[in-house]
């Protein structure tokens, strides 16, 4: 594959903004060896194509099946270990965002849909018009935040205010 084609595939076609497009309900969960197939329904299912990327709680997953108003994606074991998708149950809702094209309007941050690890929200402060969340994560896996950078939580891109070694 020519380098220019790789750039198109891996950079331009797989960008998300961290702005949630819609909530989607988990309709079915099917385990196959170490993989899990999730079936969802949402208002834009009719616009999806096989092999299209969609962020589910911020995790880039590929559409593998479309059946009427429902579509299916597959999460591999590593994805299930590093995300909260393995905790989903039928009836739960996830945040969805379709990938944007490079020439589309860019209103959020650059989000790739690759997950480093999960964290735990340890405090939420109401600042009268905005919110401050403290999220603890495993510092042994590396500092995943940069002051004034962004972090994506369940698909929602947020600006980092105070970056510490473990939060």
Indicate where each model-derived feature is located.
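Short, Lys/Arg-enriched N-terminal segments with co-localized hydrophobic residues
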Residues: 1-14
């Amino acid at each position: 594959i020519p380098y220019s084609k790789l750039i198109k595939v891996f950079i331009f076609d797989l960008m998300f903004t961290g702005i949630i497009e819609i909530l989607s309900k988990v309709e079915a969960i099917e385990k196959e060896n170490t993989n899990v197939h999730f079936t969802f329904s949402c208002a834009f299912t009719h616009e999806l194509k096989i092999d299209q990327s969609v962020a589910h709680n911020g995790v880039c997953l590929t559409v593998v099946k479309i059946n009427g108003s429902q579509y299916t994606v597959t999460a591999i074991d590593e994805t299930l270990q590093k995300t909260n998708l393995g905790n989903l149950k039928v009836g739960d809702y996830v945040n969805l965002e379709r990938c944007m094209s490079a020439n589309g309007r860019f209103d959020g941050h650059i989000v790739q849909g690759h997950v480093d690890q999960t964290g735990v929200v340890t405090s939420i402060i109401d600042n009268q018009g905005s919110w401050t969340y403290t999220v603890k994560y495993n510092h042994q896996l590396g500092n995943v935040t940069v002051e004034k950078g962004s972090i994506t939580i369940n698909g929602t891109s947020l600006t980092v205010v105070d970056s510490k070694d473990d939060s």
